[in-house]
Amino acid sequence: MKEVKIQLPVKDLPKSWYNIIPDLPQPLPPPKEPETGPSRLEFLSKVIVKECLKQEFSDQSWVPIPEELRELYIQAGRPRPLRRAKRLEKLLKTPAHLYWKREDLSPTGSHKVNTALAQLYYAVQEGVEGVVTETGAGQWGTALSYGASLMELPCVVFWVRNVHDWKVDRRTLMKMYGGEVHPSPNQLTEVGRTILKENPDHPGSLGIAISEGLEYAEKHDGYAYSLGSVLNHVLMHQTIIGLETIEQFNIVDEQPDLLIGCFGGGSNFGGFTLPFIGEVLNGKRECEFLASQSLAAPNISQGEYRYDFADHAGKTPLLKMYTLGHDSNMPPIFGDGLRYSGASPILSLLRNLGHIKTRTYPVDEKDVFEATRTFLQTEGFLPAPESSYAIRAMIDEAIECKKTGEEKTIACNVSGHGFLDIFGYKSVLNL
């Protein structure tokens, strides 16, 4: 019988991140300046940690992880296990082999810690006095608050208002880590004041929260802005997930036919899949990749592939990506970490070239959360609402394998736990 839990020894924790940019089939379209206004690239160079900006444009395939940072990863519980979902397989009566990567086991309950610790490590090296960021579902804000507490740095978080207001327990956790948490849009910023003047009850969006974080960093000396998704260096830090997973499949002498991840801006999907995609591009393996999304924000599924801003106010450079429009209005969902207008430029290019498939699910989230309940009752673990989209897609693929008799090996990334999201499940499932 195949192992149910595949644990990589600590000594085998990856020593470098993987940067896919040199292996892409086409050059990645570079960021562009808009036709009017100040230089956005110059602005970013003032508010983002310099080493992170250097990594953003790196042409190195492998970027060494500093030893002190590897120790922080180990302290945070890496390497993380890969599990075989045998009870779920049995319930579905599928010939497919189902696996899930456990990023829910981090101290804050999500994969976001992987880049939070990296960005903060470099911030301290450069003498940064504080960090500021945005957060949607709250996982990124929690991760940065956690990392900042270890580094003894102040951390300011602008949190999408409609989620901030109902996730009281996660807000408390952020504050216990020392985070200074503000609902977004907020009167603290010019961006927020303008939006609230037009609509005092605006629910907020990740694009708005990013704009507020950038403005805060610009106006507060010594502060750096940290972004939790989309950018190249963020995805690179997250490749530790996929690099571990490659070695874990080697341990059980099995290789995945399909990798699945939920998709908002792309950090968890990219971190899980890019090391595998790189091997596909280099002719070393065959595998397919599926991004699972909400119809509330189907950026990489239904967006336009064009240049657009990454934030609501247009403070960032223009990025070539699949976008719904940087100022688009998206309906609130409980999987709010997926509610973002744009997709990572790297993943957008790969999608445009046909290397990534997509699937979308209804805004009401009923089918997605029913999959969560099935997973909880078979595997015993509660995933985050965002991760539930990956689980829903994995179950759907397993059911298709039952119909066709195909013995696929399918793996999904469970990007976080849902212990602080119970209200969302209660509301949708009428519990």
Please name every model-derived segment.
Residues 102-113, 131-140, 231-234, 260-265, ...:
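Active-site nucleophile and cofactor-binding loops and adjacent substrate-binding regions
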Residues 2-128:
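Positively charged, low-complexity intrinsically disordered leader regions
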Residues 65, 79, 195-233, 252-253, ...:
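Active-site/ligand-binding loops adjacent to catalytic centers
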